[in-house]
Regions:
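Membrane-interface loops
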Residues: 32-46, 76-160, 208-225, 232
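Membrane-embedded alpha-helical segments of multi-pass membrane proteins
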Residues: 22, 60-67, 139-143, 188-192
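Membrane-interfacial alpha-helical segments at the cytosolic side of multi-pass membrane proteins
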Residues: 69-73, 141-161, 165, 191-201
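Interfacial helix-loop-helix junctions of multi-pass membrane proteins
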Residues: 111, 132-136, 171-199
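Aromatic-anchored segments of alpha-helical transmembrane domains
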Residues: 25-26, 94-102, 167-178
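Alpha-helical transmembrane segments of multipass membrane proteins
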Residues: 30, 72, 98-99, 150, ...
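N-terminal transmembrane-helix/juxtamembrane module of multi-pass inner/ER membrane proteins
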Residues: 1-67, 114, 123, 226-234
Length: 234
């Protein structure tokens, strides 16, 4: 028997997590093959010109990846139903992102980062690894908002957990514009898409799909018991 409290990842969360990773990779990277030669739009508004480049926020921007892993694992361990619901919401959000990335490909003008210093080096590293496209909606903001909304539903953690995640979500959203990886409209788009995904997942109980697939897989792979035939003598 497996002790659920000792498991880092509950068995029921395996499928949602794998689907999440695969779908995220496909949506974010494969869409670029279709939009590479398409015209890209800059959604910058006047407000963006007043937002300065602040290199220290690159630390929060990079740490967000670790924070998401923690956030998703926490609500995955909360319960099967919450795990299924929120991962289904995440799938819906990424699907919306796919259509946005292909239909309205976006770009922006990045900051001229001065050379020298660890923070500037980290920022340039982020710039070199991540092209200035697939910006609207902001996946950074979307994932962070899902983690915050998931934290509100978690009962097995400290009462301060959701408040901490709210602050983290705000800081991560701020980091996207202070590091000049996104514009303000991308933040709004990310939060709105997150709310749409959460609403649709709960409204239509989309998380049940994971249970259906899981049970069918178990039924197919489970070895059948041999039955001994009784031969009746005449």
């Amino acid at each position: 028997m497996f002790d659920m409290k000792r498991q880092l990842i509950p068995r029921y969360a395996y499928l949602p997590i794998v689907v999440c990773i695969v779908w995220n990779t496909l949506v974010y990277n494969m869409t670029r093959f279709f939009t590479n030669k398409m015209p890209h739009y800059d959604f910058s508004i006047k407000l963006d010109s007043y937002i300065p480049f602040v290199s220290s926020f690159v630390v929060i921007y990079i740490l967000s990846y670790v924070l998401w892993i923690i956030g998703f694992l926490v609500f995955a361990k909360e319960s099967r139903s919450l795990c299924n619901e929120l991962f289904a919401a995440e799938f819906v959000c990424k699907t919306i992102c796919l259509f946005c990335f292909v239909i309205i490909p976006t770009t922006m003008t990045r900051a001229n980062v001065p050379s020298g210093g660890v923070l500037n080096w980290l920022t340039n590293a982020v710039y070199s690894l991540d092209q200035p496209n697939n910006l609207f909606p902001s996946i950074h903001c979307m994932e962070s908002w899902i983690c915050f909304r998931g934290a509100l539903r978690c009962k097995k953690v400290h009462p301060m957990y959701s408040k901490v995640w709210f602050v983290l979500a705000i800081l991560i959203c701020m980091s996207t514009v202070f590091v000049k990886q996104h514009v303000f409209v991308d933040i709004i788009g990310g939060i709105v898409v997150a709310e749409i995904g959460l609403f649709l997942s709960k409204k239509f109980n989309l998380g049940r799909v994971y249970d259906v697939v899981r049970y069918k897989f178990i039924a197919i792979t489970k070895p059948k018991k041999k039955t001994n035939k009784v031969v009746l003598k005449k």
